[in-house]
Swiss-Prot record:
Glycan-bearing residues: N39
Compartments, record wording: Secreted
Name recorded for this polypeptide: Agouti-signaling protein
UniProt record, GO biological process: hormone-mediated signaling pathway; melanin biosynthetic process; melanosome organization
Highest classification ranks of the organism: Eukaryota, Metazoa, Chordata, Craniata, Vertebrata
Gene that specifies this protein: ASIP
Chief location of this protein within or outside the cell: secreted
InterPro entries according to UniProt: Agouti, Agouti_dom, Agouti_dom_sf
Disordered: annotated span: 56-101
UniProt domain comment: The presence of a 'disulfide through disulfide knot' structurally defines this protein as a knottin.
Species assigned in the record: Felis catus (Cat)
Keywords tagged on the record: Disulfide bond, Glycoprotein, Knottin, Secreted, Signal
Disulfide bonds: C96-C111, C103-C117, C110-C128, C114-C135, C119-C126
SUPFAM superfamilies listed in its UniProt record: Agouti-related protein
PROSITE patterns: AGOUTI_1, AGOUTI_2
Length: 135
């Protein structure tokens, strides 16, 4: 019986050490000069070549004009968005549930058009909540 306990204790210690060892970060091996040279040459070959092209004056002027056109079109689009009036909210349905009140599924819809019935805890507690305040 005493030998069995000693064997089980040894097995338990070995399992603990094995588990701890498996969770350790692997150590990096020191690299010598040959490994560094071969890795750097491989990395240089893997990169795609990049060609640098100088722009002439005409292409610079065209790109500036295009940029100005884009800026003016963005300004016009933003002015149109500001000028448009917001659409009116639809009137609430006659029998409705106020915001933050209980709205279990047989209950009518929420009064606020931006609110929705949100249920929690397996639909045991439901309430009307506004999810998007900028509706």
């Amino acid at each position: 019986m005493n030998i069995l306990r000693l064997l089980l204790a040894t097995l338990l210690v070995c399992l603990c050490l094995l588990t701890a060892y498996s969770h350790l970060a692997p150590e990096e091996k020191p690299r010598d000069d040959r490994n560094l040279r071969s890795n750097s040459s491989m990395n240089m070959l893997d990169l795609s070549s990049v060609s640098i092209v100088a722009l002439n004056k005409k292409s610079k002027k065209i790109s500036r004009k295009e940029a100005e056109k884009k800026r003016s079109s963005k300004k016009k689009a933003s002015m149109k968005n500001v000028a448009q009036p917001r659409r009116p909210r639809p009137p609430p349905p006659a029998p409705c549930v106020a915001t933050r009140d209980s709205c279990k599924p047989p209950a009518p819809a929420c009064c606020d058009p931006c609110a929705s019935c949100q249920c929690r805890f397996f639909r045991s507690s439901c309430s009307c909540r506004v999810l998007n305040p900028t509706c």
